[in-house]
Amino acid sequence: EAIVRDIRHLMARFADLPIVLENLPYTPHQPYAVPRPALEPALIDEVVRTTSGKLLLDITHAAMAAKYFGVDERDYLAALPGELIHEIHISGTQLGEDGLWMDHYALRDEDWRLIEWVFDRIRRGEWRRPRVATLEYGGMNLTDGRPSDRATIAQEAPRLGEMIRWMSR
């Protein structure tokens, strides 16, 4: 109830702006970690449906939550309200030396397969086609001190673009 109340307050305060709700990552190792119940697909579904009706599906956040919860990534994603997708965020994951999952890295084969699975559901009409798909790479999450690699972006962007065109056919 508190989550819905807060979102409705924001929607009233910013009534001229569209509100899109993003599924968050589960990062139990962070001091500001989102409580696990807020990441359960059933609650995400309820909150999105009773407020904005628009989901920003962060595929990597969903994959990370599923890994930490010990459930299959596809099962976790399938339980989210795919018919309410408005936007998609895509990034790669990496297992840190501390054994914790991180996002905004280069896409691994496993990440590409999950993206393809999501896009296939959209292509078949099971989920709504997003208005926007964003490749999130680099930035402050690269905790190993290295800057974002331009070659990685140059390699991943065209491949992702082709997948988006395939999804839209």
Model-derived features: positions:
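Aromatic-anchored, glycine/proline-accented short structural segments
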Residues: 34, 38-90
